[in-house]
From Swiss-Prot:
UniProt name for this protein: DNA-directed RNA polymerase subunit beta
Family, as annotated: Belongs to the RNA polymerase beta chain family.
Gene3D superfamilies tied to this protein: 2.40.50.100, 2.40.50.150, 3.90.1100.10, DNA-directed RNA polymerase, beta subunit, external 1 domain, DNA-directed RNA polymerase, subunit 2, domain 6, RNA polymerase alpha subunit dimerisation domain, RNA polymerase Rpb2, domain 2
Annotated InterPro entries: DNA-dir_RNA_pol_bsu_ext_1_sf, DNA-dir_RNA_pol_bsu_external_1, DNA-dir_RNA_pol_su2, DNA-dir_RNAP_su2_dom, DNA-dir_RNAP_su2_hyb_sf, RNA_pol_bsu_bac, RNA_pol_bsu_CS, RNA_pol_bsu_protrusion
Biological source species: Yersinia pestis
Length: 1342
């Protein structure tokens, strides 16, 4: 494998045995591709904004004299960039401008004669844009639109599985679900009649809809039944015989023909009898007259002479009717063929309960059902029915729906109209009846072929269309009202409804969520999440067990492990690593093609529907060098089941062992040795890890760490190769390689880094460069590490030396004992940044003022404020300190004469304002790292605001000037090269000032052209700089657009440093979570023979019952990795020659059985080997991919190489007594995470606080400064102890006895510690509640 210079700094030893056939795809593509589809111009108009416009336009006036046509649209440039939007709290969006054409037709002239055409570009609101990391900035906060898994449009056949009716009879139903429009359901009732429902309303006999479609009774019977023809000849009745129809019947008479008896009376007709009849070619037999009684006529029979109806279609025949028919000269009688086995008379029965007789009465019935209480007219009824399923405005199956519909009905073509046709409805009914008759299967609703993904783009398009439809109504009215000659398209369109619909979706839809920004993994997982909830989806309460369950089609598409615990389990899933959506929105997963038992490198993506027809081998099947299966029988999946197949039968093979899991689960090493429940917790808890101060790469990883770190967007990645020209904490400058440059550019890339910003979860986002000056860079190399990344690899926690042993009960019930060394070394210290805002409003009594002049506040409290009343940057503040001084005017109170006198004497004016300053919340202490002041346009800026503005201008100028200088230097270097190659001496050039170089002329024409091109570019660059500077200045100095009534907003950012402490929650990656019980002095921790103490002591009893053995294997492998690191460290300290070092490291990389990774250190220079060794001395990082990891044998070999016992256990000594422990203890390195459940955020005690309005009891919870609830069971406990006085004060003065508690306060102030309990308020509430039920209760005095 070829490594770039940067990748050679630290190479992770990979134990994977299977070669990587397919690179891991870009992990955020589901979001970015979907949104790209939404905003890019689509000439076909199949999706995105284009489709929405084309579906609504052209809009015609009611009279048809004019119409508004859509021409094209364009998105403008956003006003602010992403960072500015976050700071200012605005939405990152671009204006949408649409070109519309108003066409006015001549009134009297023939149709289509154009009188006037006006074209104009119209503003249609703002469209939020996606940032490059797949998020949206809405009102300054980053949000993610989660993809939705919903039922695909189309037709579904299902049954109630016998649950509806008490008899347990299975009732079948069919449902046509459009993308938008009314649902159409067909269902059987227990009596086997077929009913129809529209939009889940009252049911009607299904034949009503057929009558509404203009079918007559005879046509309906013709559609659904086969015919049996009886002939009357010579007063004898003959029946046309189709032998196959007789199977399974019992003969009610002797079946004979040509004098031969084929079946005797009362015998069952078998396949042998049928073969005999067919062989002899018998096509009609004589039947007794009674046989026809009870049969149903297929059409109307009329007496030709009188025109009288003898027998209507669907009537049962009797012997009388037969005689009448015979008299009227009808010799042939068509009846319906039905039997109880597989030709039920369902439609015939339904027609009997159908109250309607013709189209009109059917339409009226449907109208009454849809609009009860409205008088139906013929026109209204026709319109309603027409609009339900046959109008393109109201009904759309969509391309997906039509494809699914046609596939379900086994039609050949997959395209077609978006509305329903007569055939569609009748074929659905036919198929439903076939299923009831025992032919065909019901669909599995949880099959991923019947559920599809709706991503951002599609949902935004739907919302946009909703907005457009609202506008359409208004436009129609304007077109028919006004004076068209003076109207322009702009006057028709009101952008408000459109932007309101879009804003509502991005701001408050259930699927638009506040981004989980704890760490890079939680961001990536959030963007790849798939939810079955949301508008048009399921609800938590109604979702049954089946929907939540893992389905065989989830394989490779949806992760079976990662899903939340609790009420949402199984409803919110995560996309598998390699999964993607196809054009219809169904999930696909890649497979390698297998031909004649040989696995090729051809890769096909299959959806769940396509996959069902193939035999698919697992990724860990053994292959020889040519890719042929070694075993004759291979374990494969087919039609959702797993079994053995011969190698010739195999069609496909999995691409990778990680294919079935999501990104989160693929980061758990030895996942294959963990119980699924614990793996679920492990995958979920990794997302809650807080980025530590110093990120530390996991010693034992899975090889996915780099992909996650790079794709998440928290690192800075090189867009083009080159060399590092300049690097500091906030900027990296790369001089681009010649071959990657565009002609005529300076060839300089500048990467500005993010410094100490707040994330959505209040953790700290900070980037640090990880390249040095002069280093060669290749495209895709990581230049700067973000939060929780280390040299471009995800690093969520720290590698800790753990021992599995009990220690004095401090690790009882999953508690964790931690060494003080962990705190001293700041291993789990995290930085949290809080934003506190102070808003100054315009009140009725006058404006609030931000000032340092606050009434009744001492000097000390104001010591950290500047003269504007805003805290200094760098000030260390604690709970209760003032951050921003603010006073609010209060209403004039009536003054007593004494007060008036005092006022007159001392001139005190401050008492007409009250202090409403922003203070640090209790329990928080930290350092102020940033202050921002936003001032409304037209309000004078205070001194601090001007200072900040000045500083920002200075910084912007400095940045842009430096950028210009860097670009100029690059450009002049190229000019210099051109001039020297053109024959001018370098010495002479150095004497000329650089600006004059451009004036020189060259004889060589090509060179002169080059020079002119560069000169042109130089001018362009300078004017560009001026433009940028002007724009920057404008943005910084302009006032801010604040909410109505707000004059000023001051935002203060506090950085809080939190060390680990008892009560914090920690976890490993295998679901092994616990709370820190004690931080133990280093000298008391158990230590080994070398005197090295362990960092953490875990309880061994937490392993066997939880069955997450992965943590033990990780511990052993971590120990081996550390052992090898220590050996390398010893060699470096001894300053061994590079050859020895190279040999040892090579040995470590080569270890393992037929491992794929090949690292050839002979191609590395000595410097590169030394740098690699330097990065490996803390431990050699190891990758053990999911389901393809290190074996026990390999772990033992690695332990041996590191000079450690192969048992993985060592002798430990007690730190307090120095005595050896009885038996050896498992010690090793485990990757531990500190989770975002910190005791500081949870600890809370109430003093005096607010009370609930109704019950007058203290509120609950930290946010409300609430109390601890003394609940029902606690009361029982006190009752059981007989602690009457304690109980009394709990239920009265400490809770809701209003008078009692004020009296008690007064008593305590007076130094008298008695209490006088009264009536608890909750008792009054109870009385009121009983009275509200009409029962009068009164309290009587004794």
């Amino acid at each position: 494998m070829v490594y770039s210079y940067t990748e050679k700094k630290r190479i992770r030893k990979d134990f994977g045995k299977r070669p990587q056939v397919l690179d891991i795809p870009y992990l955020l593509s589901i979001q970015l591709d979907s949104f790209q589809k939404f905003i890019e111009q689509d000439p076909e108009g199949q999706h995105g904004l284009e489709a929405a416009f084309r579906s609504v336009f052209p809009i015609q006036s009611y009279s048809g004299n004019s119409e508004l046509q859509y021409v094209s649209y364009r998105l403008g440039e956003p006003v602010f960039d992403v960072k500015e939007c976050q700071i200012r709290g605005v939405t990152y969006s671009a204006p949408l401008r649409v070109k519309l054409r108003l066409v006015i037709y001549e009134r009297e002239a023939p149709e289509g004669t154009v009188k006037d055409i006006k074209e104009q570009e119209v503003y249609m609101g703002e469209i939020p844009l996606m940032t490059e990391n797949g998020t949206f900035v809405i009102n300054g906060t980053e949000r993610v639109i989660v993809s939705q898994l919903h039922r695909s449009p189309g037709v579904f056949f299902d049954s109630d599985k016998g649950k509806t009716h008490s008899s347990g009879k299975v009732l079948y139903n069919a449902r046509i679900i459009p993308y938008r429009g009314s649902w159409l359901d067909f269902e059987f009732d227990p009596k086997d009649n077929l009913f129809v429902r529209i939009d889940r309303r009252r049911k009607l006999p299904a034949t009503i809809i057929l009558r509404a479609l203009n079918f007559t009774t005879a046509q309906i019977l013709d559609l659904f039944f086969e015919k049996v023809v009886f002939e009357i000849r010579d007063n004898k009745l003959q029946m046309e015989l189709v032998p196959e129809r007789l199977r399974g019947e019992t003969a009610s008479f002797d079946i004979e023909a040509n004098g031969k008896v084929y079946v005797e009376k009362a015998r069952r007709i078998t396949a042998r009898h049928i073969r005999q009849l067919e062989k002899d070619g018998i096509d009609r037999i004589e039947v007794p007259v009674e046989y026809i009684a009870g049969k149903v006529v297929a059409k109307d029979y009329v007496d030709a002479s009188t025109g009288e109806l003898i027998c209507a279609a669907n009537m049962e025949l009797s012997l009388d009717l037969l005689a009448k028919l015979s008299q009227a000269g009808h010799k042939q009688i068509e009846t319906l063929f039905t039997n109880d086995l597989d030709h039920g008379a369902y439609i015939s029965e339904t027609l009997r309960v159908d109250p309607t007789s013709d189209r009109l009465s059917a339409l009226v019935e449907i109208y009454r059902m849809m609009r009860p209480g409205e008088p139906p007219t013929r026109e209204a009824a026709e319109n309603l029915f027409e609009n339900l399923f046959f109008s393109e405005d109201r009904y759309d199956l969509s391309a997906v729906g039509r494809m699914k519909f046609n596939r379900s009905l086994l039609r050949d073509e997959i395209e077609g109209s978006g509305i329903l046709s007569k055939e569609d409805i009748t074929e659905v009914m036919k198929k439903l009846i076939d299923i009831r008759n025992g032919r065909g299967e019901v669909d599995d609703i949880d099959h991923l072929g019947n559920r599809r993904i709706r991503s951002v783009g599609e949902m935004a398009e739907n919302q946009f269309r909703v907005g457009l439809v609202r506008v359409e109504r208004a436009v129609k009215e304007r077109l028919s009202l006004g004076d068209l000659d003076t109207l322009m398209p702009q006057d028709m369109i009101n952008a408000k409804p459109i932007s309101a619909a879009v804003k509502e979706f991005f701001g408050s839809s259930q699927l638009s969520q506040f981004m989980d920004q704890n760490n890079p993994l939680s961001e990536i997982t959030h963007k790849r999440r798939i939810s079955a909830l949301g508008p048009g989806g399921l609800t938590r309460e109604r979702a049954g067990f089946e929907v939540r369950d893992v389905h065989p089609t989830h394989y490779g598409r949806v992760c079976p492990i990662e899903t939340p615990e609790g009420p949402n389990i199984g409803l919110i899933n995560s996309l598998s690593v390699y999964a993607q959506t196809n054009e219809y929105g169904f999930l696909e997963t890649p497979y390698r093609r297998v031909r004649d038992g040989v696995v090729t490198d051809e890769i096909n993506y299959l959806s769940a529907i396509e996959e069902g027809n193939f035999v698919i081998a697992q990724a860990n099947s053994n292959l020889d060098d040519e890719g042929r299966f070694l075993e004759d029988l291979v374990t494969c999946r087919s039609k959702g089941e797993s079994s053995l197949f011969s190698r010739e039968q195999v069609d496909y093979m999995d691409v990778s062992t990680q294919q079935i899991v999501s990104v989160g689960a693929s980061l758990i090493p030895f996942l294959e040795h963990d119980d699924a429940n614990r793996a679920l917790m492990g995958a979920n808890m990794q997302r809650q890890a807080v980025p530590t101060l110093r990120a530390d790469k996991p010693l034992v990883g899975t090889g996915m760490e780099r992909a996650v770190a790079v794709d998440s967007g928290v690192t800075s990645v090189a867009k083009r190769g080159g060399t590092v020209q300049y690097v500091d904490a906030s900027r990296i400058v790369i001089k681009v390689n010649e071959d990657e440059m565009h002609p005529g550019e300076a060839g300089i890339d500048i990467y500005n880094l993010t410094k100490y910003t707040r994330s959505n979860q209040n953790t700290c986002i900070n980037q640090m460069p990880c390249v040095n000056l002069g280093e060669p860079i290749e495209r895709g190399d990581v230049l700067a590490d973000g939060p929780s990344t280390d040299l471009g690899e995800l690093a969520l926690g720290q590698n800790m030396r753990v021992a599995f042993m009990p220690w004095n009960g401090y690790n009882f019930e999953d508690s964790i004992l931690v060494s003080e060394r962990v705190v001293q070394e700041d291993r789990f210290t995290t930085i949290h940044i809080q934003e506190l805002a102070c808003v100054s409003r315009d009140t009725k009594l006058g404006p609030e003022e931000i000032t340092a002049d606050i009434p009744n506040v001492g000097e000390a409290a104001l010591s950290k404020l500047d003269e504007s009343g805003i805290v200094y940057i760098g000030a260390e503040v604690t709970g209760g300190d003032i951050l921003v001084g603010k006073v609010t005017p209060k209403g004039e109170t009536q003054l007593t004469p004494e007060e008036k006198l005092l006022r007159a004497i001392f001139g005190e004016k401050a008492s007409d304002v009250k202090d409403s300053s922003l203070r640090v919340p209790n329990g928080v202490s930290g350092t102020v790292i940033d202050v921002q002041v936003f001032t409304r346009d037209g309000v004078e800026k205070d001194k601090r605001a001007l200072e900040i503005e000045e500083m920002q201008l200075k910084q912007a100028k400095k940045d842009l000037t430096e950028e210009l200088q860097i670009l100029e230097a690059g450009l002049f270097a190229r000019i210099h090269a051109v001039l020297v190659s053109g024959g001018i001496e370098a010495e002479k050039l150095s004497k000329l000032p650089r600006e004059r170089w451009l004036e020189l002329g060259l004889t060589d024409e090509d060179k002169q052209n080059q020079l002119e091109q560069l000169a042109e570019q130089y001018d362009e660059m300078k004017s560009e700089f001026e433009k940028k500077m002007d724009a920057k200045r404008r943005k910084i100095t302009q006032g801010d657009d604040l909410a109505p009534g707000v004059l000023k907003i001051v935002k203060v950012y506090l950085a809080v440093k939190r060390q680990i402490q008892p009560g914090d929650k920690m976890a490993g990656r295998h679901g092994n979570k616990g709370v820190i019980s004690k931080i133990n002095p280093i000298e008391d921790m158990p230590y080994d023979e070398n005197g090295t103490p362990v960092d953490i002591v875990l309880n061994p009893l937490g392993v066997p019952s939880r069955m997450n053995i992965g943590q033990i294997l990780e511990t052993h492998l971590g120990m081996a990795a550390k052992g090898i690191g220590e050996k390398i460290n010893a060699m470096l300290k001894k300053q061994e020659e590079v050859a020895k070092l190279r040999e040892f490291i090579q040995k470590a990389y080569d270890l393992g059985d037929n491992v794929c990774q090949k690292v050839d250190l002979s191609t590395f220079t000595d410097d590169e080997v030394l740098r690699l060794a330097e990065n490996l001395k803390k431990g050699m990082p190891i990758a053990t991919p999911v389901f393809d990891g290190a074996t026990e044998k390999e772990i033992k070999e690695l332990l041996q190489l590191g000079g450690l016992p192969t048992s993985g256990q060592i002798t430990l000594f007690d730190g307090r007594t120095g005595e050896q422990f009885e038996r050896q203890v498992t010690v090793g390195y485990m990757y531990m995470l500190k989770l975002n459940h910190l005791v500081d955020d949870k600890m809370h005690a109430r003093s005096t606080g607010s009370y609930s309005l109704v019950t007058q009891q203290p509120l609950g919870g930290k946010a409300q400064f609430g109390g601890q609830r003394f609940g029902e069971m606690e009361v029982w406990a006190l009752e059981a102890y007989g602690a009457a006085y304690t109980l009394q004060e709990m239920l009265t003065v400490k809770s809701d006895d209003v008078n009692g508690r004020t009296k008690m306060y007064k008593n305590i102030v007076d130094g008298d510690h008695r209490m006088e309990p009264g009536m608890p308020e909750s008792f009054n509430v109870l009385l009121k509640e009983i009275r509200s039920l009409g029962i009068n209760i009164e309290l009587e005095e004794e």
